[in-house]
């Protein structure tokens, strides 16, 4: 066996092992845990010498006074004495432990509301594909994720929705599904199969809603399609957040879409008509509307750095970093599939074999936050907010809700115990807790 084949086999085994560990951990009851001596970074700002305590259900206390930390630990049955505290260099993330972060940054878990896969698997690939792809993103700090499903024949999309629905009860990290298609403009289809694109007539809307069984969180729709505005109203009435994207809509039509109930712009700048002083298009319509969350792929390829800074500045507290990550994320260059379409990944950039169209990214939210701070000059609080609180707000997950129970996106009492520790120099994720379960 060649050395490269052996290395590939070892990598597959390692990733399957981590996916199994995630499965087991999320299936077990959570235990109290605490973290101290961290640099807290969330949407509310930065704080030094910070600590956090969870009772195994939610965050119950935070602060920067040592005496308060000991009392908070005692209230959930933990011992804050020095002899019982593990350091980040030890096996300190065991359930029920008290961890000394040794000055590492502590952030909420990242929330990705638009991603298709990772680790060689797509969210369209059934239970096994979802397990592996979610493990890949979990490894890099994405504790909660909306699973994006690519355009396929309607029967296939319905079956994929049913799979996501079936996994949600056992997987608190899965927030639901996002349908990117099939109601997209042919002229802005990007890496979607043109043979599967449709006008969103009521029959198709009803079929997808029925198959989803309540798991559908968002759906991208080109509002200029004949039934586009009506479909936006129908999905919004059913509790789904429609997104304007993959469209050729003018400014007025995009405004109609948002007024009809669309609450998201799918990856701003990509797969839509751009900014023009006499033909403003959909972007200003989204920027002007305080109800709209704006997705942005901060990889420097989908959107180059000057436009990332400009776009974020349009609506800094409404712009959510998303990855649009496909199966090749965190994998070597090579040949992959996006739905039924062939994709070549070269230098980490995914393009369709057929016409060279960009075919998703190989980005993680870990990398998006790193780029924002270390390359683009974002403040730490702004960068973290774009990967935590802002995407959570798009679906009301920033407050108590039936899906996540506790709100997401802040390190504050009452919020979900989704916590990351990061290397302060590189912003690389080193430790992960999801729903109070230690996963890395």
Language-model features, listed with the residues they occupy:
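Divalent metal-dependent hydrolysis catalytic cores, especially in the metallo-beta-lactamase
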Residues: 116, 131-160, 173-185, 212-224, ...
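His/Asp/Glu-enriched, well-ordered alpha-helical/loop segment
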Residues: 284-294, 312-325, 329-422
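N-terminal metal-binding scaffold of metallo-dependent hydrolase/deaminase domains
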Residues: 3-79, 85-90, 426
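Active-site core of metal-dependent hydrolases
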Residues: 206, 210-331
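Alpha-helical scaffold segments that flank or form the walls of functional sites
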Residues: 104-105, 113, 123-173, 196-211, ...
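Active-site gating loops and adjacent loop-to-helix segments of metal-dependent hydrolytic enzymes
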Residues: 136-146, 185-213, 255-268, 272, ...
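Residue-level marker for buried hydrophobic side chains located in beta-strands
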Residues: 34, 109-111, 243, 321-322, ...
């Amino acid at each position: 066996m060649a050395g490269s084949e052996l290395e590939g086999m070892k990598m597959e085994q390692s990733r399957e092992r981590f996916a199994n560990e995630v499965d087991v951990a999320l299936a077990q009851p959570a235990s109290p845990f605490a973290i101290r001596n961290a640099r807290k970074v969330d949407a509310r700002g930065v704080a030094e010498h910070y600590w956090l305590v969870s009772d195994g259900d939610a965050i119950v206390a935070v602060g920067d006074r040592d005496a308060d930390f000991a009392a908070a630990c005692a209230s959930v049955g933990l011992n804050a004495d020095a002899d019982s505290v593990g350091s980040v260099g030890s096996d300190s993330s065991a359930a029920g432990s008290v961890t000394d972060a040794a000055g590492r940054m502590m952030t909420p878990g990242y929330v990705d509301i638009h991603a298709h896969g990772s680790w060689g698997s797509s969210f369209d690939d059934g239970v096994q594909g979802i397990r592996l792809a979610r493990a890949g993103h979990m490894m890099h700090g994405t504790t909660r994720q909306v699973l994006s499903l690519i355009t396929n024949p309607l029967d296939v999309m319905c079956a994929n929705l049913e799979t996501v629905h079936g996994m949600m009860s056992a997987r608190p990290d899965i927030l639901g599904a996002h349908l990117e298609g099939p109601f997209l403009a042919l002229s802005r289809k990007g890496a979607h199969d043109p043979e599967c694109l449709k006008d969103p007539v009521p029959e198709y809307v009803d079929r997808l809603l029925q198959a989803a069984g309540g798991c559908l969180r968002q759906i991208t729709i080109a509002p200029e399609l004949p039934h586009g505005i009506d479909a936006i109203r129908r999905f919004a009435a059913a509790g789904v957040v429609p997104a304007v994207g993959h469209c050729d809509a003018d400014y007025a039509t995009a405004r109609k879409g948002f007024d009809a109930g669309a609450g998201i712009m799918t990856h701003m700048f990509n797969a839509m008509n751009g900014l023009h002083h006499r033909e403003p298009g959909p972007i200003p319509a989204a920027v002007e509307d305080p109800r709209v969350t704006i997705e942005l792929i901060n990889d420097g390829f989908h959107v180059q750095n000057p436009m990332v800074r400009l776009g974020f500045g349009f609506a800094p507290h409404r712009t959510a970093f998303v990855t649009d990550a496909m199966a090749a994320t965190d994998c070597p260059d090579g040949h992959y599939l996006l739905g039924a379409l062939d994709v070549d990944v070269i230098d980490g950039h995914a393009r369709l074999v057929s016409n060279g169209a960009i075919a998703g990214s190989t980005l993680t939210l870990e990398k998006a936050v790193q780029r924002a701070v270390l390359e683009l000059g974002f403040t730490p609080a702004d960068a973290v907010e774009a990967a935590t609180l802002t995407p959570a707000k798009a679906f009301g997950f920033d407050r108590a809700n039936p899906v996540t129970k506790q709100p997401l996106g802040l390190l504050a009492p009452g919020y979900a115990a989704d916590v990351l520790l990061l290397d302060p120099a590189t912003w690389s994720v080193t430790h992960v807790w999801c729903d109070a379960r230690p996963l890395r």
